[in-house]
Amino acid sequence: MKLKTHDDRLTLTNGSYHALVHARKPKGIENKSAYLIGTGIGALAAGCFLIRDAHMDGSKITFFEQLDLPGGSLDGEVLQNLGYVARGGREMGHHFEVLWGLFSSLPSTEDPNMTVLDHFFYTNYDDPNYSNCRITHKNGERYDNAKFNLGQDLAKELAEFVLIPDEELQDKSIDEIFSEELLNTDFWTLWRTMFAFENWHSALEMKLYMNRFIHHVGGLPTLSALQFSRHDQYTSFVKPMVIFLKELKDFY
């Protein structure tokens, strides 16, 4: 498979031989500048990659941000009369290849002897995420039996759903596509509570989530498929990128 790259000889391959090679400095990079809107994780990561892989001088990178705190929704700060506020945490998984590729080369602010990825990995290795009981009802009684209770017909309905062309799901809600029986299964309860879906949400978004996170299905009943940073994601993820960008340190 050909890649969209300045070098036509590069192709997608198996193994790590090509992935571990440091990128060459592109011709003419000294004459280029980058202007990034916002300081969410996407913009911060782009800045880090421009320095690490494109060898762009940090002085040529400009961020436009209206807020006092970088990180977009990955914020976290002490607010007067409110206490410490962070807008939620993001559920992480093994297959965030681009993110982990970046964090494998950024020093952790929580342990200077580790990279961000090292610290994240060992946090979850030593204290893996696991829920003995995902759902309760009737004032604390266990609700689920750690099974999806789908049956063959409903499992087939899900399989057929992910094969529907995107165009046919435009402007359709989940409850317009899924049967009432499927919406009353434990699978749907487990899925919707993990990914914050409502029945009236976009069917197309549901399909995209299933395509992206289907490998997490086995861990739905126990949340064992998920990993979390030790602290809020501003502290664990945003600060290391901001510090690197400010200090313009060499990655290698």
Where do the model's predicted regions map?
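Glycine-rich FAD pyrophosphate-binding loop
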Residues: 51-78
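Extreme N-terminal leader/targeting segments of oxidoreductases
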Residues: 1-34, 52-59
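A short, Lys/Arg-enriched amphipathic alpha-helix followed by its capping loop at the start of a domain
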Residues: 46-59, 244-250
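Glycine-rich Rossmann-fold phosphate-binding loop(s) that bind the pyrophosphate
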Residues: 38-41
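A generic secondary-structure signal for well-formed alpha-helical elements
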Residues: 54, 68, 74, 96-111, ...
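Active-site/ligand-binding neighborhood in enzyme catalytic cores
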Residues: 156-252
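Short amphipathic alpha-helical face segments that pack within enzyme cores
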Residues: 45, 49, 98-101, 236, ...
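Dinucleotide-binding Rossmann-like beta1-alpha1 core, especially the glycine-rich loop
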Residues: 81-164
